[in-house]
Amino acid sequence: MAVQDLEFERLLAAMKKATGVLQEAGVPFVLGGGLACWARGAPKTEHDVDFLVRPEDAERAQQALADTGMRTEKPPEGWLLKAYDGDVLIDLIFDPQGGPVDDQTFARADELEVYATRLQVAALEDVLVQKLLALSEQQPDFSSVLELARSLREQVDWDEVRERTAASPFATAFFTLLDELEIVQK
């Protein structure tokens, strides 16, 4: 098995373990980020496991993971908490770009089977909005979100994503790129 495949297997194992812990603790969550996209057909991710939790549940979620022996951190950014299953990073995101995780985040999610585990998976529009609004002068890299757009284009409500990201010049530039490459049409 290739190193990349082993890394992905470790990521999935950490996701499955954390899912079980959070479900057992009764903490509502939604799988987000690259794994939410992979669950719908995007390429494998190698970065981390992203769980979206309501702000009022974030510390309880982190404590539940800590109680199983996972190392935890409270980064200074103030919009997420972290846990580590070995060296696999698990982000507990409660206030991403675009606004805090709320009831609407959960309402838009779908229950899917991911790696033999049933869980709520974030809507693609939510993942793309968060990724586009995170782009900045310090981090202007369109490559990962462009890859997602190519692989998931037929599944995304692009009008919704455009509307929710309209205030971002980076999102505007991204949509110009998508239009010029004929990945999506206005």
Give the role of each language-model region.
Residues 1-186:
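Compositionally biased terminal segments of proteins
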